């Protein structure tokens, strides 16, 4: 039976653990779960805005979500320090549970972890810091099934060589190292692995998948990554992976060319949403829309009364169908 996750309720004391079964996510009853949700902005920003609270998560739930993604920028992690930031995450995990949603913890860096060259200052990290982050997350949340997913690295890219070189084999080994560290601490959160081209391209998985069981793959197929018609290109670039492994699109979204914050690769219209929803329905792929915020783009709403933006209107309706 294919269902959207409805397994968390504030009235329930037990949250069902999510696991990988073949190419599906399943709950403890063996039911297939297709996840749908939104990425928050960085908890650090939401604290600054005074919005890191239950009302924010309840609003997200009302917009049709059963999953929320926390993008944790390395610079924000260092700014607060491990203990203070973990306290923020504890709050967010509790808010998500109360609202009936699962959580993705996302190490939100962009660049080349091998060379330790990154696209901007707030994405700066090191292999050591990244490994230590996942060790801390594994220890903290190994017994908390609300934290269903660990997105190991947001958007890997060598930026056409500007950030150095990294082969798939080298990137695969780094991910396998993180998975080893996480699982050695008894943590059952599902590792999410991205490919190059800013987490778009999963073609190397066909011949050289991650050497670990219970893993899922991610793509960020924004509209301008490929020209219309998208569907066959999506299948060739990342969709084929869903024949063997679970896939979750941890960033999708769009805005008009004249909308606030419009930038490549997100400029499009509702036809992108229609194509993506049809594709996910056909394949069972899960998805997360970027971003549940009024400032970061493409934004979901235009004010803190949660007045939907153009894409906000679209995803709110789509996820509540």
Task: Give, region by region, the residue ranges found by the protein language model.
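Extracellular glycoside hydrolase catalytic/binding regions
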Residues: 17, 49, 121, 128-149, ...
